[in-house]
Curated annotation (Swiss-Prot):
EC number(s) given by UniProt: 2.7.7.6
Protein name as it appears in the record: DNA-directed RNA polymerase subunit beta
Subunit structure: The RNAP catalytic core consists of 2 alpha, 1 beta, 1 beta' and 1 omega subunit. When a sigma factor is associated with the core the holoenzyme is formed, which can initiate transcription.
Gene name of the record: rpoB
Protein species of origin: Citrobacter koseri (strain ATCC BAA-895 / CDC 4225-83 / SGSC4696)
Record carries keyword Zinc: no
High-level lineage: Bacteria, Pseudomonadati, Pseudomonadota, Gammaproteobacteria, Enterobacterales
Domain of life: Bacteria
Matching Pfam families: RNA_pol_Rpb2_1, RNA_pol_Rpb2_2, RNA_pol_Rpb2_3, RNA_pol_Rpb2_45, RNA_pol_Rpb2_6, RNA_pol_Rpb2_7
Catalyzed reaction equations: RNA(n) + a ribonucleoside 5'-triphosphate = RNA(n+1) + diphosphate
Gene Ontology molecular function terms on file: DNA binding; DNA-directed RNA polymerase activity; ribonucleoside binding
A Gene Ontology cellular-component term: DNA-directed RNA polymerase complex
InterPro entries referenced in this protein's UniProt entry, alphabetically: DNA-dir_RNA_pol_bsu_ext_1_sf, DNA-dir_RNA_pol_bsu_external_1, DNA-dir_RNA_pol_su2, DNA-dir_RNAP_su2_dom, DNA-dir_RNAP_su2_hyb_sf, RNA_pol_bsu_bac, RNA_pol_bsu_CS, RNA_pol_bsu_protrusion
Function: DNA-dependent RNA polymerase catalyzes the transcription of DNA into RNA using the four ribonucleoside triphosphates as substrates.
Keywords: DNA-directed RNA polymerase, Nucleotidyltransferase, Transcription, Transferase
Stated family: Belongs to the RNA polymerase beta chain family.
Length: 1342
């Protein structure tokens, strides 16, 4: 296996057996590809902005004399880059400019004669852009648009499963769902009549819609029924015989022909009878006259002579009618073929209850149902019906919908129109009737073939289209009204509705969510999330059990494990590792093709529908070297069921064992040994891990850590290979390899690192270089670690030495006992950054002012502020300290003009302003690490703002000039090379100043050309530098665009360092969570024979009942990994020769049966081996992939290699007494996470504080500085104990007795502890409520 330079530094030993056929795809592609499709020019006009424009334009005027046509669009450049947008609190977006053409036609001339054409580029608002990591910056905060799983457009056949009607009869229904437009439902009622509903309105007989489509009763019956033909010959009734139709019926008369009786009266007609009739080719049989009674005529019969209607279509025949028909000369009578078994008379019955009899009455009926109360006119009724399903503006099935529609009706072509046709509606009704007749199955709506993914691009396109449609109306008005000769396209278009629609979607849609930025994993998971909620989706309350459940089609597409606990369970899912969406938006997953029993490396992506036709083997099926299955019978999946198949029946095989699970679940080692519920908690809790001060890679991982760290975008990754030319804490410079350079560039890549920034969850984002000077790097190498990454691998927690044993009740109920050493070594210390903002507004009484001159505040409180009234950077502040001094004018007193004059002269200010400074919230203390001041355009900047500006300018200049120097150096080294090769002596050249080099001339023409080219590049470089510097200066010095009424905003950033402490929540990766109960001194912790104390003591009772055994295997394997690290450490300390070191490390890597990873340390130089050993000192990292991990035997071998007991248990001694514990204890290394549920954020106490206005009771909750609720049940408890005085105190002075509590406060201050309870305010509220009912209730003094 080839390792890149960074990977060589620390290779993870892989226990995976199955070869990696397909690399893990880029994990954010679902977001990036979708948005790319939205903004990129699409000549076909299928997707994105192009599709939206084409669907709305051209817009014609009502008269048809003019139209506005769309030509093309372009997106401009964003004004600010992503970081600037975040700092300034603006949206990262680009202006959209559209080229439109206004065409005016001649009025009198023949149609299509053009009078005038005007073309112009029009601004159409801003389109938010996606950052490289798949997020959007909206108003300065990073947001993610979650993909939605919604019901695919098309037609669905379903049943109520017998739940609607009391008889338990199953009622079938069909529903045509368009991408946009009205829903059309057909449904049976318990009497087997067929009804139609439009948009879930009142139901109408289904034949009304057929009549509205211009069908007559005869045509309707013709469409849905076969005919039975009777002929009257010689006063006898004969019936044309179709033997197949008789099957299963009981003969009501002898069936005979040519003197032979085939079936006797009363006998059941069987397949044998039918075969005989067919064999003898019987075409007609004689039937008794009574047999026709009750049959239904299929068409109108008219008396030719008189023109009188004897029998109408769909009328039941009787013997009288038969006689009349016979008399009027009708000898051939057509009736409908129905029976109770599989040809029900549903449509015939429906026609009977249909009140309409022609097209107009049907349209009127539909109009009345859609618009009750409006008087119908013929035109209104016709246009309403036309617009419902047959107008492209109002109705669209979309390509997906048409494909699903045609597939469902078993048509051959999958393309077609987006609107419905007559045939579409009739075919749906026919299929529904077939299902009712017992032919065909209903659809499964939870099948992933019937649900599709709607991603960012598509949702943004829909919103954009909504905006365009709003504009369309206005444009139509203007085209009809105005004087067109003077108007230009930009006078027609108002960009407001478009930007409003887009802004609303990105800012406040249910699917546009505040990004979860706790750690890199939570970012990636959030972007790969799939929600069934949101506009056009389900709601929590309505979603039943079936929708939430795991479906067989989820395999390899949606993770069966990772979903929230609580009301959203199963509605919010996570995409599986290898899943992707196809062109229609259905999820598909990769499989290896199996040809002639040989598994090939050919990969096919199959959607849920396609998968149903194949037999698919599991990824853990054993193969020989040629790729044949070893076993005769292979475990496979087919049509949603799992069973054994012979090896030559197999069509496909899974790509990887982790194909089933999501990224979060694929990071849990030994997932196969955990109960699913606990694995769910484990996957969810990894997302809540707070990045620790020093990241520590997991000793036991799954091999997915690198993919997650790199794809999440928190690390700095090399764009091109080269060598590290410069590196410090905030920037890395790479000199690019010759072969990767673009022609004519300096070949220098500069990576600026992010330093101590705040994430959405107030955790700290900080990048640190992990390469050193002169190191070679390749494309894709990790150059700098971000939060929670260690040498390019995801590192959410810390490796802890744990023991499973009870310890004095301190680990009762999942509590965790932690050693003091963990605190001392800052293992779980985290940095949290809080942003506090102070806004100075323009009020009615005058502007608020940011100043250090605050009334009634002592010197001490102002000691940390500068002269502008803003806190210094580096100040240590605690709760209640002033960060930004601000005063607000207060205007209770109306001043006389004389007073005003005096005020103006003497500037007596303090009396009319109140202190509204920004203070540190209670319970928070930290260090100020940054201050930003934003000043409105046109408002004078204060001293601090100017200082900050100057600093930023200086920094920008320094950055740019350093960049220029680096690029210049690169360029001059190339100039040097050209000059030397052109014959100039190197020594002389070095004596010349660099800028004079370009003045030299060379005789060789080719070299001279090269030199001139380089000189041009040099000039361009300087010019570019000036331009960049000017742009930066302009951005820094220009005023800020603040909200109306805001003059200034000061943002202060506090860094809070939080050590681990009792009450903090910790967890492993297997759903084993607990709260720290005690931090124990090191000397009291249990220790082993070598005197090494354990770090954490966990309760063994937390394992068996929860069935997450993965944690125990992880503990053992972690111990082995650490043991090997210890041996390497000892060898390094003894300075043993490299050969021995190489041999031992090689043995460790080779251990384990037929593992896929072959590490050959002989290809490593001695230096590389030493560096590797240095990085393995703390333990050899191990990968045990999901469902393909280390076996028990392999763990034992590894323990043996590390000189550790293979039982995984050791003898421990009690730290307090030094006595040995009576049994050996499982001790090992487990990866523990500190979760973002910190006790500091939850601890809260109140003495006095704010009260609710109406009830005068204290508020509740930490945010309001509220009290503890003493509720109804607590009152009962005091009553039960008879604690009368305590109860009285609780209900009066401690709560809402206003006078009593004020007096009480005074008494306590005076040292007098007497209590005088009065009337609780809530009693007055009760009185008022009773009075509001009109009952006068008064309190009388006795």
């Amino acid at each position: 296996m080839v390792y890149s330079y960074t990977e060589k530094k620390r290779i993870r030993k892989d226990f995976g057996k199955r070869p990696q056929v397909l690399d893990v795809p880029y994990l954010l592609s679902i977001q990036l590809d979708s948005f790319q499709k939205f903004i990129e020019q699409d000549p076909e006009g299928q997707y994105g902005l192009e599709a939206a424009f084409r669907s709305v334009f051209p817009i014609q005027s009502y008269s048809g004399n003019s139209e506005l046509q769309y030509v093309s669009y372009r997106l401009g450049e964003p004004v600010f880059d992503v970081q600037e947008c975040q700092i300034r609190g603006v949206t990262y977006s680009a202006p959209l400019r559209v080229k439109l053409r206004l065409v005016i036609y001649e009025r009198e001339a023949p149609e299509g004669t053009v009078k005038d054409i005007k073309e112009q580029e029009v601004y159409m608002g801003e389109i938010p852009l996606m950052t490289d990591n798949g997020t959007f910056v909206i108003n300065g905060t990073e947001r993610v648009i979650v993909s939605q799983l919604h019901r695919s457009p098309g037609v669905f056949f379903d049943s109520d499963k017998g739940k609607t009607h009391s008889s338990g009869k199953v009622l079938y229904n069909a529903r045509i769902i368009p991408y946009r437009g009205s829903w059309l439902d057909f449904e049976f009622d318990p009497k087997d009549n067929l009804f139609v509903r439009i948009d879930r309105r009142r139901k109408l007989p289904a034949t009304i819609i057929l009549r509205a489509l211009q069908y007559t009763t005869e045509q309707i019956l013709d469409l849905f029924f076969e005919k039975v033909i009777f002929e009257i010959r010689d006063n006898k009734l004969q019936m044309e015989l179709v033997p197949e139709r008789l099957r299963g019926e009981t003969a009501s008369f002898d069936i005979e022909a040519n003197g032979k009786v085939y079936v006797e009266k009363g006998r059941r007609i069987t397949a044998r009878h039918i075969r005989q009739l067919e064999k003898d080719d019987i075409k007609h049989i004689e039937v008794p006259v009574e047999y026709i009674a009750g049959k239904v005529a299929s068409k109108d019969y008219v008396d030719e002579s008189t023109g009188e209607l004897i029998c109408a279509a769909n009328m039941e025949l009787s013997l009288d009618l038969l006689a009349k028909l016979s008399q009027s000369g009708h000898k051939r009578i057509e009736t409908l073929f129905t029976n109770d078994l599989d040809h029900g008379p549903y449509i015939s019955e429906t026609v009977r209850i249909d009140p309409t009899n022609d097209r107009l009455s049907a349209l009127v009926e539909i109009y009345r149902m859609m618009r009750p109360g409006e008087p119908p006119t013929r035109e209104a009724a016709e246009s309403l019906f036309e617009n419902l399903f047959f107008s492209e503006d109002r109705y669209d099935l979309s390509a997906v919908g048409r494909m699903k529609f045609n597939r469902s009706l078993l048509r051959d072509e999958i393309e077609g129109s987006g609107i419905l046709s007559k045939d579409d509606i009739i075919d749906v009704m026919k299929k529904l009737i077939d299902i009712r007749n017992g032919k065909g199955e209903v659809d499964d709506i939870d099948h992933l073939g019937n649900r599709r993914i709607r991603s960012v691009g598509e949702m943004a396109e829909n919103q954009f289209r909504v905006g365009l449609v709003r504009v369309e109306r206005a444009v139509k008005e203007r085209l009809s009204l105005g004087d067109l000769d003077t108007l230009m396209p930009q006078d027609m278009i108002n960009a407001k509705p478009i930007s409003a629609a887009v802004k609303e979607f990105f800012g406040s849609s249910q699917l546009s969510q505040f990004m979860d930025q706790n750690n890199p994993l939570s970012e990636i998971t959030h972007k790969r999330r799939i929600s069934a909620l949101g506009p056009g989706g389900l709601t929590r309350e309505r979603a039943g059990f079936e929708v939430r459940d795991v479906h067989p089609t989820h395999y390899g597409r949606v993770c069966p494990i990772e979903t929230p606990e609580g009301p959203n369970i199963g509605l919010i899912n996570s995409l599986s590792v290898y899943a992707q969406t196809n062109e229609y938006g259905f999820l598909e997953t990769p499989y290896r093709k199996v040809t002639d029993g040989v598994v090939t490396d050919e990969i096919h992506y199959l959607s849920a529908i396609e998968e149903g036709n194949y037999v698919i083997a599991q990824a853990n099926s054993n193969l020989d070297d040629e790729g044949h299955f070893v076993e005769d019978l292979v475990t496979c999946r087919s049509k949603g069921e799992s069973s054994l198949f012979s090896r030559d029946q197999v069509d496909y095989m899974d790509v990887s064992t982790q194909q089933v699970v999501s990224v979060g679940a694929s990071l849990i080692p030994f997932l196969e040994h955990d109960d699913a519920n606990r694995a769910l908690m484990g996957a969810n809790m990894q997302r809540q891990a707070v990045p620790t001060l020093r990241a520590d890679k997991p000793l036991v991982g799954t091999g997915m850590e690198r993919a997650v760290a790199v794809d999440s975008g928190v690390t700095a990754v090399a764009k091109r290979g080269g060598t590290v030319q410069y590196v410090d804490a905030s920037r890395i410079v790479i000199k690019v390899n010759e072969d990767e350079m673009y022609p004519g560039e300096a070949g220098i890549d500069i990576y600026n690192l992010t330093k101590y920034t705040r994430s959405n969850q107030n955790t700290c984002i900080n990048q640190m270089p992990c390469v050193s000077l002169g190191e070679p790097v390749e494309r894709g190498d990790v150059l700098a670690d971000g939060p929670s990454t260690d040498l390019g691998e995801l590192a959410l927690g810390q490796n802890m030495r744990v023991a499973f044993m009870p310890w004095n009740g301190y680990n009762f109920e999942d509590s965790i006992l932690v050693s003091e050493r963990v605190v001392q070594e800052d293992r779980f210390t985290t940095i949290h950054i809080q942003e506090l903002a102070c806004v100075s507004r323009d009020t009615k009484l005058g502007p608020e002012e940011i100043t250090a001159d605050i009334p009634n505040v002592g010197e001490a409180a102002l000691s940390k502020l500068d002269e502008s009234g803003i806190v210094y950077i580096g100040a240590e502040v605690t709760g209640g300290d002033i960060l930004v001094g601000k005063v607000t004018p207060k205007g209770e007193t109306q001043l006389t003009p004389e007073e005003k004059l005096l005020r103006a002269i003497f500037g007596e200010k303090a009396s009319d302003v109140k202190d509204s400074s920004l203070r540190v919230p209670n319970g928070v203390s930290g260090t100020v690490i940054d201050v930003q001041v934003f000043t409105r355009d046109g408002v004078e900047k204060d001293k601090r703002a100017l200082e900050i500006e100057e600093m930023q300018l200086k920094q920008a200049k320094k950055d740019l000039s350093e960049e220029l120097q680096i690029l210049e150096a690169g360029l001059f080294s190339r100039i040097h090379a050209v000059l030397v090769s052109g014959g100039v002596e190197a020594e002389k050249l070095d004596k010349l100043p660099r800028d004079r080099w370009l003045e030299l001339g060379l005789t060789d023409e080719e070299k001279q050309n090269q030199l001139e080219q380089l000189a041009e590049q040099y000039d361009e470089l300087k010019h570019e530098f000036e331009k960049k510097l000017e742009a930066k200066r302009r951005k820094i010095t220009q005023g800020d665009d603040l909200a109306p009424g805001v003059l200034k905003i000061v943002k202060v950033y506090l860094a809070v360092k939080r050590r681990i402490q009792p009450g903090d929540k910790m967890a492993g990766r297997h759903g084993n969570k607990g709260v720290i109960s005690k931090i124990n001194p090191i000397e009291d912790m249990p220790y082993d024979e070598n005197g090494t104390p354990v770090d954490i003591v966990l309760n063994p009772l937390g394992v068996p009942s929860r069935m997450n055994i993965g944690q125990i295997l992880e503990t053992h394997l972690g111990m082995a990994a650490k043991g090997i690290g210890d041996k390497i450490n000892a060898m390094l300390k003894q300075q043993q020769e490299v050969a021995k070191l190489r041999e031992f490390i090689q043995r460790a890597y080779d251990l384990g049966a037929d593992v896929r990873q072959k590490v050959d340390l002989n290809t490593f130089s001695d230096e590389e081996v030493l560096r590797l050993a240095e990085n393995l000192r703390k333990g050899m990292p191990i990968a045990t992939p999901v469902f393909d991990g280390a076996k028990e035997a392999e763990i034992k071998e590894l323990l043996k290699l590390g000189d550790l007991p293979t039982s995984g248990q050791i003898t421990l001694f009690d730290g307090r007494t030094g006595e040995q514990f009576e049994r050996s204890v499982t001790v090992g290394y487990m990866y523990m996470l500190k979760l973002n549920h910190l006790v500091d954020d939850k601890m809260h106490a109140r003495s006095t504080g704010s009260y609710s206005l109406v009830t005068q009771q204290p508020l509740g909750g930490k945010a309001q500085f509220g009290g503890q609720r003493f509720g109804e049940m607590e009152v009962w408890a005091l009553e039960a104990y008879g604690a009368a005085y305590t109860l009285q105190e609780m209900l009066t002075v401690k709560s809402d007795d206003v006078n009593g509590r004020t007096k009480m406060y005074k008494n306590i201050v005076d040292g007098n502890h007497q209590m005088e309870p009065g009337m609780p305010e809530s009693f007055n509220v009760l009185l008022k409520e009773i009075r509001s009912l009109g009952i006068n209730i008064e309190l009388e003094d006795e």
